Structure formats: structure tokens, C-alpha cells
């Protein structure tokens, strides 16, 4: 029997890196509302008392960067100096320039179908049938813990909570099946007045127990709740935040490979983002079709070239048909050229701020989570 542990982590919307991601994607959304053809690469840096928004943007749109940045920070919950960061009073610096004309000539084409990739690179997509959303369980539940922390904080159930938090879930496997939770780590920023005893009890009862399946918890499960004993200083006052530093949290929690490209602040012409979404869409449809229990897709692109330079399918011994057939089906049923995948997934819409916390995958509101190709894939593979 094969026994092992696997762990994934998540961070809250108030984590400094996630503040930066949300600001970058809020800028992208506001631009796409006005200018669907915009080219956006927006990066954000946050630290005590300041937010710096920079990058390369070519657009006909006008966005009030300062007010938008302040609104995002306040929406997250940083709206009073007591928290060490205040969206109303922090400095907002704007260092945005235009996208290089050298890149433009490689991407833009007279025929939209010939639109080239915005850069070279490799992208991975993954799906597994171990959860109902066809995502790895550890990252799924780590995200749900963070969503629950935000919910009880914002609704006032636990009014002493503050926006910055992290979670980590370690699952026990036997023969690749989950048999329980080995350990849970949950660290949450809090106000100075709450006792550690009350914090531990409240986090356990209001955050952990409502989220994790009861049948996975046992007397052997270990809980590490604010293990340093104090977490009052947090957010950008505790650590600086940068766009694109939580790429494993954003994807599969380490259960699949990653091409290295971050998502937030990038318009869909950047295949770092759009092709990673397409790869998830392909992998999820293969698993939903019952063609494999686990599936990983690798795509690669060359700057200025429309067609992928490679497509790889790996099913880790769980495939019901040969991987070579799956590659052929991917080529037949999915248009993975930049223009094709943007159209296939309807990516030119202002949906990106919502992706910037709690994971880009496994959330049914996003178009790359559809399984609308599953039946035709199964039929084409010859499975009844």
C-alpha cells in the first residue's frame, strides 16, 4: 500500500501579494470595459503607507488609477490606520508606460486569426477527479478556509479578525485516495485585544470545522492556529507585496507543474495567462469526459507565432485511452492559437479582479471551468 502526505497553502485577499494582484487586475478590468483591444501589463508594489502601480499599457481608455487603487484596498478591509494600512490615506504612485512597439508588431495582425503569442513560454493546465470541481483537494480546501476567514471577518461574526491570513492543509493518502487530514495551519491577523485562547477556539469553530469534511478529521489531526502566538502586525506593514508572487497559490498548490508566468495584471493577449486558462479548460474536459482520472496539459508558444509550438498530455497512468490519441483530440477540438482561445473562452471581459484571490481554478463562475466539450471528447475517443 502506498501511503504519503501532500500539502498545499493559500493566502487571504488581505495578504500583501494578493493586494497587489487585485489592484493590477482591477486596473485591467477597468481598461477592458472601455477598450477591448488594450494591451495591459500592470504590476503593483505595496508597502507601509504606499502603493506603486506600474507597467506597460497601450490603450485608448482612461482610468483613475489613484481612486481605483484606494477603492480596492478599502474593499479588502484596510480602511483605518489601526490596521497598519489605510486605503484612504496611503500614497498612490503611478509609473505606467506604453507597451513596446517591437512586441506590438509580433502580436497584432491584419487577420485576427493570425494574432501571434505575446511572448514565448510554457504553460500547464491540470485536473483531477478527487474533488467535485476537478481540482486537487489540498489547495481547494486551503482556499475555502481563506474564503471563510474573509466571510466571518466582513460579516462581523469575528470582528477582531484583520485582513491578512494564510492557510495550509496536509492530506493523508493511501493508494492515491484521501483518507484524512493530517494537519491544518491557519494564521490570521487579529486586533490586539483578543486572547489567544479565544482566538484558537473561534478559528476552530467558525473557520476550520465549517469548511473541512468532518469525516477527514480525527483525534490524530494536528491544528496549528497562529503558531507564533501573535499576529497583530500584518498586511503591507508587515511585508511588502508584489504582483505575481503567489503563482502556486493561484494554480494547483504544487500538485501540478507551473510554467513560471504569473497571471494578474495581464490582458488575454499574454499567453502566460490565457494559455494557462486554456490548458486548464482542456485538462478539465478530458477528466470530465472520463478519459483520465488525472490530466496535465503542457502548451508552449513562440513570440509572434500563432500556433502552439508543442502540446503535451500526461495522465499519470490513469488514462482510458493513449496519450497520443488525447493530443490528437486536443488539436481537433480546441483552437489554442491566441485569438482562438480568447474567443473560445470569451476572455475579453472584465472578470479578472475576481480571479486575483482564492485561486484562478476550480471556481465555476469562470469560463475556463466549463465542461462543455466533455461529451464530444468521450464520443470521439470511442468510449460509451
Swiss-Prot record:
Cofactor: Mg(2+); K(+)
UniProt GO MF annotations: ATP binding; magnesium ion binding; methionine adenosyltransferase activity
Superkingdom: Bacteria
Residues where Mg(2+) binds: 17
Binding site for ATP: 15, 164-166, 230-231, 239, 245-246, 262, 266
Annotated EC: 2.5.1.6
GO biological process: one-carbon metabolic process; S-adenosylmethionine biosynthetic process
Family from the record: Belongs to the AdoMet synthase family.
Function noted in UniProt: Catalyzes the formation of S-adenosylmethionine (AdoMet) from methionine and ATP. The overall synthetic reaction is composed of two sequential steps, AdoMet formation and the subsequent tripolyphosphate hydrolysis which occurs prior to release of AdoMet from the enzyme.
Protein name: S-adenosylmethionine synthase
Species classification: Bacteria, Pseudomonadati, Pseudomonadota, Gammaproteobacteria, Pasteurellales
